[in-house]
Amino acid sequence: MDAKLYNLNDMVRVNCNDCQGCFSCCQGMGESIVLDPYDIWQLENNLNTTFAGLMQEKIELNIENGLILPNLKMCGTLDTCGFLNEDRRCGIHKFRPGLCRLFPLGRKYESGELRYFLLEDACTYSAQTKAKVKKWLDIADGRKYENFLIAWHDLRKELQDKIGNSSDEAVKEINLRFLHIFYEKQYLADDFYVQFEERMKRFKG
C-alpha cells in the first residue's frame, strides 16, 4: 500500500490505457466486490430490474462480520464477473459499482473523513499515468457521494459492533430489517441521496 493519502482533487497514478486486453480485476474476486445502496440504485435503474432480479444470477449474499451484504457474483470456468461481456469487457461500465470504479485505489475512513490510497501492484498494467481522483471515480457530485459513503460505513460499523454482542435471534432480526430497507425495497430513479436519507431515518427510527 502506498502510504500517501489522497483526496478528490489530488493526482494519482491510476490510468491504465482503458484496460485494453485485460480483465484481471474482473476475475477471481470471490466475495470482495461488496455492493452498497448506491450501487444497487444504479444497477436497478440502468438495467430496469429489481434486487430480486439481480439475485437470480448477477449478485449473491454473504456475511461480513455478522452483517449480510450483497456482492458481485463470480461465475463460469474462468470465475469472472457475471457482467463481463463476450469481448471480456465490462457490460455495465457506465454504471459499474463503486469498488470497481475505485480500483486500484482503496478507501480510508478516519474521524468522519474519507481519503484514498493506492494499492501497490494491484493493477497488472505497468505504465500507469496520473489522473485526478474525482475524474477516475467519475461520479457526479463527488462530495455528496463521499458523504453517503461515510454515513454508510459508519452504519455498517455500528451494526457489526452491535451484532457482535447480540443473540442469534437479534442478529437475524437486524439483518432482515437491514436488507429489506436498504436493498430489497425498490429504488426509484429519483435523487438517490434523498431516498437514502429517508431510509436511514426509517431504519434508525
Set out the residue ranges of the language-model regions.
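Short loop/turn segments that flank or connect secondary-structure elements
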Residues: 1-205
